[in-house]
Amino acid sequence: MRINPTTSGSGVSTLEKKNPGRVVQIIGPVLDVAFPPGKMPNIYNALVVQGRDSVGQPINVACEVQQLLGNNRVRAVAMSATEGLTRGMEVIDTGAPISVPVGGATLGRIFNVLGEPVDNLGPVDTSTTSPIHRSAPAFIQLDTKLSIFETGIKVVDLLAPYRRGGKIGLFGGAGVGKTVLIMELINNIAKAHGGVSVFGGVGERTREGNDLYMEMKESGVINEENIAESKVALVYGQMNEPPGARMRVGLTALTMAEYFRDVNEQDVLLFIDNIFRFVQAGSEVSALLGRMPSAVGYQPTLSTEMGSLQERITSTKEGSITSIQAVYVPADDLTDPAPATTFAHLDATTVLSRGLAAKGIYPAVDPLDSTSTMLQPRIVGEEHYETAQRVKQTLQRYKELQDIIAILGLDELSEEDRLLVARARKIERFLSQPFFVAEVFTGSPGKYVGLAETIRGFQLILSGELDGLPEQAFYLVGNIDEATAKAMNLEMESNLKK
């Protein structure tokens, strides 16, 4: 964080040192600070507590002003641990909100909520910073055209397409391929759209954050040899951090993404894992500030806080921020205020299925549970819409027949249903796809499949033109031509064995 926007580096101007405040009360991560008359800081201003603890170690704790209490006192929330702070310590008003580094120098690096690098790779090589609190783009700046954000992933583009500048909820448990799907999206946006990504780890486990970083380095999303060629910036506020840091880390990631959109005019992917932790941290801070709790103990400002974050995630005439947010649903209760407030902002949902992952079908996106507001004929066109609906109908009918097949066997079905089951199994396998970021694990080259190719492939399966091909020919291939080539290879191999 730049302590004072009018000075270079992290220095504090002498003018500010003439009127420092003093800590008068500390309750956990909440501090009350008294300032001289007429020198009160504004709401959201960053304060810095400076001094030494009982063993002589220097203290430098950043806080954010949340309330003006009267009698020249303010209440602030600390962004790091408050151990060692004592009453009477000097507090400096920086005169501005928390500001974080932005631009290309952030790619390949890991930051905390204050924009300080935490990856031991030295300081960030940029003088450009931006405050984390800002207004959402004005309506006149918005790009109101509805356009599909092509990901190159067949199951997503066909059945639950993402909106450019939209918000997508990602639902999935542990071990179903959520991280790999996130990394593939980061890789594909860099290749197809020349875009970059920002990953905001909001209240996630430190181990998971470290695993993600290591996997990104392994798959090439973060380039260790030339860090400037990396495709993603990481911002972490883990579970063990104070609630103030977890509440604001999402805004830090969003601020970095906004710079790529507004100044570099790029398409940006913003990942937030987990949006529920943002709400949870806000609830903790609200209670610490003494606000009356609302439904189920959540903060009374839940909708306002969620709206102020989500409304900044949008398309403008310069570029777009498309956000993919992991959503934790407490006790699987979709009516809980936290997920219910999140759903109001989502354009699409991508649901990962443990059943599909168990079958080895990756990405394990559930084609029947995943939804999108973009799947309308007037937006995607009649051809795309009809193909998607027929694919869903075929898979739904197959799902209904599975109990009969399990009890009586496939032979008891009518000829028509047997044909439908065969096509559904081919569709299910054709929805799988080899990923670029999984090449190092699978040995199979990744595939980016354009939307037109995806639609053509599923139309050929539905029309019955490919009924003669074995279903394993459709497993983990790119477009439909690769499936027919794979079928020929399988036939040649079986002939050689004979």
From Swiss-Prot:
One of its GO terms (molecular function) is proton-transporting ATP synthase activity, rotational mechanism. It catalyses: ATP + H2O + 4 H(+)(in) = ADP + phosphate + 5 H(+)(out). ATP binds at G172, G173, A174, G175, V176, G177, K178, T179. Its EC number is 7.1.2.2. PROSITE patterns: ATPASE_ALPHA_BETA (PS00152). Keywords: ATP synthesis, ATP-binding, CF(1), Chloroplast, Hydrogen ion transport, Ion transport, Membrane, Nucleotide-binding, Plastid, Thylakoid, Translocase, Transport. It is a peripheral membrane protein. It is found in: Plastid, Chloroplast thylakoid membrane. InterPro entries: AAA+_ATPase (IPR003593), ATP-synt_VA_C (IPR055190), ATP_synth_F1_bsu (IPR005722), ATPase_a/bsu_AS (IPR020003), ATPase_alpha/beta_chains (IPR050053), ATPase_F1/V1/A1_a/bsu_N (IPR004100), ATPase_F1/V1/A1_a/bsu_N_sf (IPR036121), ATPase_F1/V1/A1_a/bsu_nucl-bd (IPR000194). Signal peptide: none annotated. It is an enzyme of class 7 (translocase). One of its GO terms (cellular component) is mitochondrion. GO terms for biological process: proton motive force-driven mitochondrial ATP synthesis. It comes from the Eukaryota. HAMAP family: ATP_synth_beta_bact. F-type ATPases have 2 components, CF(1) - the catalytic core - and CF(0) - the membrane proton channel. CF(1) has five subunits: alpha(3), beta(3), gamma(1), delta(1), epsilon(1). CF(0) has four main subunits: a(1), b(1), b'(1) and c(9-12). Produces ATP from ADP in the presence of a proton gradient across the membrane. The catalytic sites are hosted primarily by the beta subunits. Belongs to the ATPase alpha/beta chains family. This is ATP synthase subunit beta, chloroplastic. It comes from Nicotiana sylvestris (Wood tobacco). The gene is atpB.
